[in-house]
């Protein structure tokens, strides 16, 4: 017995008195048990009690089918709620209606959470979706889900509607399996009456037992035959019957949950589509764009993967490897007269034989066009180099590039670091680079070098005597099989105030003795008078015959022709001799003279460094030239 009123009860009494109701009328209304009991059974079912209704708790379950007018009849939003399933009890026979009311009243007296778990288990056992419960009872989908899954409190009127549906559904399912062989249902008119309200039918839903059987079959065979599908139908229906606690012979009682051959076929087709989609998604993710910033491949197809990268000096080479383009740098060579003398800005590039085809010698990036002409075409008709690799951005941005084109021989002079090129190119006069283009036929191909503020002058120098090598030393044994065999003579000379010439002999075996060095291109910077002093001379040297580094290749002893430029200081004349190292200098610049050799022949190219350690240069292992 409650001695004091709660705050809510006090507010309710105050509201009744303020509405104009007198105390006498209120007491008289409380003294009338009939109407008040039917109105107040909802709150009292939850344990709430008022002064005059404490002794009426035992009468709460009665009158479930009667009309109620308390706050229990309203929803959470305050709207009136009248479960339609409760009104349908009037359509049943008196015996059936009395039986259902008795069962529902017994469920209302039990723990709501225990009954909710029982209803949820029944839904899962028979693969009944909650949508069917919502359509039949008119309950809120979210409220029903929370009540069944979390035990959220539900008003008595709504629970009575849920329990009424539960009792009726049990009776319908039992009748289905009992009369499965007859193909008819006793409660069919009542069952059809409910779904027609929204014009919807129960959707087929795969049960856990059937899914387990189908997934095991999918692992064995992703596309079963018709006979295999029919076997799976029997297994699934048997499992569904066992799950529901009935005999497999009553499989027709599954109703809308009956497994058919068409449904099994659709299930396998959907699984195959899902697997194909996941595979495609995985392949798209795997074959996506690489995170690296480089747009081009790191190594071309014709590069040698076995070439050791440690052959270059790691102290000077910054990321320069065989088959890779180096970063473009600009080296300003100081001069004694003040100011930079020569600026060389060209990266080391590998030229493939396919890049030297006549159809691929046009370069729009270099703003040069090629045209056929006489022995010495004009400067405006120069051709540029092409390579399979994409050129670095720094190369396209700098206009001071040494562009050379020769069929079949091409080479490029790359930039050097100031620390390494400084001692080499420091002079008081103009500097000149002499590049030899070796081929079996005399050609006159112009070379332009727009370095600094002056235009380079081009002039070929013809040599009638061929050069015969007496030395052949391998440069890099791991890549000898990838290096082509072709004649080549490259001479790089630096003309200081007293001119000095650096020359070397080619290391090519089995070449023709005619027209080996038909011409040499001279690239001068500022002093054009130095061209007049260049005179070809012949010096004969006799040496013993040395065997080639490759078996089966021998060279006879023969005179060798060198290029001599008169110099005021003979001590500055340097000669490049063959060696096994890239350079005799302890520090080798990553940018210098590069020789390229095509891969369709079997020769070898070598490095001939300076004996005095003045020139810091290296020669690569490829020359785009074919002289077979």
Curated annotation (Swiss-Prot):
Region entry Dimerization, spans: 1-31
Domain HNF-p1: 1-32
Disulfide pattern: none
Domain of life: Eukaryota
CDD domains in the cross-refs: homeodomain
Phosphothreonine carried by residues: 74
Organism, scientific name: Rattus norvegicus (Rat)
Nuclear localization signal (motif): residue ranges: 197-205
Annotated gene: Hnf1a
GO molecular function: chromatin binding; DNA binding; DNA-binding transcription activator activity, RNA polymerase II-specific; DNA-binding transcription factor activity; DNA-binding transcription factor activity, RNA polymerase II-specific; double-stranded DNA binding; identical protein binding; protein dimerization activity
Gene Ontology cellular component annotations, sorted alphabetically: chromatin; cytoplasm; nucleus; photoreceptor outer segment; pronucleus; protein-containing complex; transcription regulator complex
The name this protein goes by in its record: Hepatocyte nuclear factor 1-alpha
Region of interest: Disordered: 47-79, 183-205, 284-338, 541-585
Family: Belongs to the HNF1 homeobox family.
Function noted in UniProt: Transcriptional activator that regulates the tissue specific expression of multiple genes, especially in pancreatic islet cells and in liver. Binds to the inverted palindrome 5'-GTTAATNATTAAC-3'. Activates the transcription of CYP1A2, CYP2E1 and CYP3A11.
Domain named POU-specific atypical: residues: 87-182
Pfam family, one: HNF-1B_C
GO terms under biological process: apoptotic nuclear changes; bile acid and bile salt transport; bile acid biosynthetic process; blastocyst development; bone resorption; cellular response to glucose stimulus; cellular response to L-leucine; cellular response to rapamycin
Predominant location category: nucleus
Annotated region of DNA binding: 199-279
Pro residues compositional bias, start-end: 288-298
Region (Interaction with DNA): 130-132, 143-149, 155-158, 203-206, 263-265, 270-273
Keyword Glycosyltransferase: no
Cross-link (Glycyl lysine isopeptide (Lys-Gly) (interchain with G-Cter in ubiquitin)): 117
Record key words, sorted: Activator, DNA-binding, Homeobox, Isopeptide bond, Nucleus, Phosphoprotein, Transcription, Transcription regulation, Ubl conjugation
Post-translational changes noted in the entry: Ubiquitinated in s SPOP-dependent manner; leading to prteasomal degradation.
């Amino acid at each position: 017995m409650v001695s004091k009123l709660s705050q809510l009860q006090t507010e309710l009494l105050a509201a009744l008195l303020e509405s104009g109701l007198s105390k006498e009328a209120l007491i008289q209304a409380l003294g009338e048990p009939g109407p008040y009991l039917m109105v107040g059974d909802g709150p009292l079912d939850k344990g709430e009690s008022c002064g005059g209704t404490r002794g009426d708790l035992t009468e709460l379950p009665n009158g479930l089918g009667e009309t109620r007018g308390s706050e229990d009849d309203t929803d959470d939003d305050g709207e009136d709620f009248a479960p339609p399933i409760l009104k349908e009890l009037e359509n049943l026979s008196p015996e059936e209606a009395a039986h259902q009311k008795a069962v529902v009243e017994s469920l209302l007296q039990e723990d709501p959470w225990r009954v909710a778990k029982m209803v949820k288990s029944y839904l899962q056992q028979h693969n009944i979706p909650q949508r069917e419960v919502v359509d039949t009872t008119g309950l809120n989908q979210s409220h029903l889900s929370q009540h069944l899954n979390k035990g959220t409190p539900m008003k008595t009127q709504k629970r009575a509607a849920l329990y009424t549906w539960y009792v009726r559904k049990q009776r319908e399912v039992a009748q289905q399996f009992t009369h499965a062989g007859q193909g008819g249902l006793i409660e069919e008119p009542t069952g059809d009456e409910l779904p027609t309200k929204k014009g919807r039918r129960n959707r087929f839903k795969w049960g856990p037992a059937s899914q387990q059987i189908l997934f095991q079959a999918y692992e064995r065979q992703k596309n079963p035959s018709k006979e295999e599908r029919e076997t799976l139908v029997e297994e699934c229906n048997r499992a569904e019957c066992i799950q529901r606690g009935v005999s497999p012979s009553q499989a027709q009682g599954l109703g809308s949950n009956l497994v058919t051959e068409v449904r099994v076929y659709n299930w396998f087709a959907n699984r195959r589509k899902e697997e194909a989609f996941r595979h495609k998604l995985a392949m798209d993710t795997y074959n996506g764009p690489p995170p690296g910033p480089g747009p081009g491949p790191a190594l071309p197809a014709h590069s040698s993967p076995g070439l050791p990268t440690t052959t270059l000096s790691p102290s000077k080479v910054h990321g320069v490897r065989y088959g890779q383009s180096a970063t473009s740098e600009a080296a300003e060579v100081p001069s004694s007269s003040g100011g930079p003398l020569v600026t060389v800005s060209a990266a080391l590039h590998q030229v493939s034989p396919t890049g030297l085809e006549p159809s691929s010698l046009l370069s729009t990036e270099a703003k040069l066009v090629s045209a056929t002409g006489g022995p010495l075409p004009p400067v405006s008709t120069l051709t540029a180099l092409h390579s399979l690799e994409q050129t670095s951005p720094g190369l396209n941005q700098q206009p001071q590039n040494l562009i050379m084109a020769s069929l079949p021989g091409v080479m490029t002079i790359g930039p050097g670091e100031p620390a390494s090129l400084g001692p080499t190119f420091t002079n008081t006069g103009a500097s000149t680079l002499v590049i030899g283009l070796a081929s079996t036929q005399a050609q006159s191909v112009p070379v332009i070098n727009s370095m600094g503020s002056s235009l380079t002058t081009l002039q070929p120098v013809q040599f009638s005597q061929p050069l015969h090598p007496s030395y052949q030393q391998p440069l890099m044994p791991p890549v000898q099989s990838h290096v082509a065999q072709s004649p080549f003579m490259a001479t790089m000379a630096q003309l200081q105030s007293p001119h000095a010439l650096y020359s070397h002999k080619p290391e090519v075996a089995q070449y023709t003795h005619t027209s080996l060095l038909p011409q040499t291109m001279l690239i001068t910077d500022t002093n054009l008078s130095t061209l007049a002093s260049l005179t070809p001379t012949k010096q004969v040297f006799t040496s013993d015959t040395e065997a080639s580094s490759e078996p089966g290749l021998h060279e006879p002893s023969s005179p060798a022709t060198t290029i001599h430029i008169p110099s005021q200081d003979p001590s500055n004349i340097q000669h490049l001799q063959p060696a096994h190292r890239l350079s005799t200098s302890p520090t080798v610049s990553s940018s210098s003279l590069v020789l390229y050799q095509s891969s369709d022949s079997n020769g070898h190219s070598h490095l001939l460094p300076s004996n005095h350690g003045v020139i810091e240069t290296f020669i690569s292992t490829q020359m785009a030239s074919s002289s077979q």
